[in-house]
Every structure is written in structure tokens, then in C-alpha cells.
Amino acid sequence: MNAFNTYSVLNIDLDAIASNYRYLRSLVNSSICAGVLKADSYGLGIEGIAPILYNEGCRHFFVAYTNEAVALKNVLSTFQQKIHIYVLNGPYLKGWEDYYHHHQFIPVLNDLEAVHEWQSYGKEISQKMPAVCILTLA
């Protein structure tokens, strides 16, 4: 066999994904253990991975972009318990706040401008708005 006749095969052990989540969850005890499903679950397919994590008790999920949040919400729409979807790279375009609020997406705010926009939106509608804030100050 030469290099031109070889190919790669990737086998994904879905039971190992479930087992790894259970193990990580056991390490954090009563803290939240979230699943990170960005980039279509790192190429494994959000429609296959999200239900596995959900069935293991995962209710908090991080995605990279809003379109991934929509896809995740659709995949898990038939499940009974509420899920929390955190979006790492929000669009931050005019009107994004209404969209996130309507779909119950939780933004990960990466700069003070986004923090102020989200805070102002909450004041406008008289609600406290959930968010994760990651600010790196130099």
C-alpha cells in the first residue's frame, strides 16, 4: 500500500462523550457543567451530540454564533426541561437585544459597550437580563 491508497477514518464513540460529561459533572458537584457545541459540535454534528448531553442532564450549552443557537434550540425543542443557550460571539447589531430576549439566548458579553447595551435594554423592558461577562483589561 502506498500513500496514494490510504485514507483516514474517524470513529466517534458517543458513549464516551456521555461518559466524559458524567465524569466532568461529578468533578464540579453542585456547580453547573455546560456543554460546548460550537462549530457544529466541533464537526461531530449538533443534532447527534446535543441530545446525548441533554439525556445526561446537561441543560447549559455554549455555542459560538447566533445561527448555532437557533440550530441547538431546534434540535432540543421536543425535550421537556428548559435549556440555557449561551452565545459566545453575539451579533451586536442594532436590534440584537430583542432577538436574544425573544429566543431566550444568553449573550457572552466581551466588551463594555455590549454590557451597556444589554443593561440599557433590560432597563427599557424593566427586566433583569441574564448574561455572562468576560472582559480582559490591559
Model regions and ranges:
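Short, basic/glycine-rich phosphate-binding loops at helix/coil junctions
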Residues: M1
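Active-site-proximal beta-alpha core segment in soluble small-molecule metabolic enzymes
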Residues: F4, V9-I12, N29-A138
